[in-house]
Amino acid sequence: MRHYEIVFMVHPDQSEQVPCMIERYSAAITGAEGKIHRLEDWGRRQLAYPINKLHKAHYVLMNVEAPQEVIDELETTFRFNDAVIRSMVMRTKHAVTEASPMVKAKDERRERRDDFANETADDAEAGDSEE
């Protein structure tokens, strides 16, 4: 089986359906003896340019190992699903399991925000104890 990276963008009005879509696509992959190495839900993000008069979309990234028949089925499903605005399937040489740069940046921002909140709370406690 080959390794693939799949990115699809969902219409922003259909964001509630994304978990069900991910579950359905994951079941199709694992049902055909495939493996999901990485699954990231990037959420709603700004588009670089408008697509069908839309400026935002819900992004999902999957790195999978699956037979060609499943990939063909997924591409057909993406094509005929009105909620999927764009999709891209790329073959990769190896399984990619580490976090993508998008998730790494998000985690770094979250850590910095948490550190800042902790420092602010510590400063407030120190100020209260001095009074």
Swiss-Prot record:
Keywords: Ribonucleoprotein, Ribosomal protein, RNA-binding, rRNA-binding. GO terms for biological process: translation. One of its GO terms (cellular component) is cytosolic small ribosomal subunit. Residues 98-131 are annotated as: Disordered. GO terms for molecular function: small ribosomal subunit rRNA binding; structural constituent of ribosome. CDD domains: bS6. Belongs to the bacterial ribosomal protein bS6 family. Binds together with bS18 to 16S ribosomal RNA. HAMAP family: Ribosomal_bS6 (MF_00360). This is Small ribosomal subunit protein bS6.
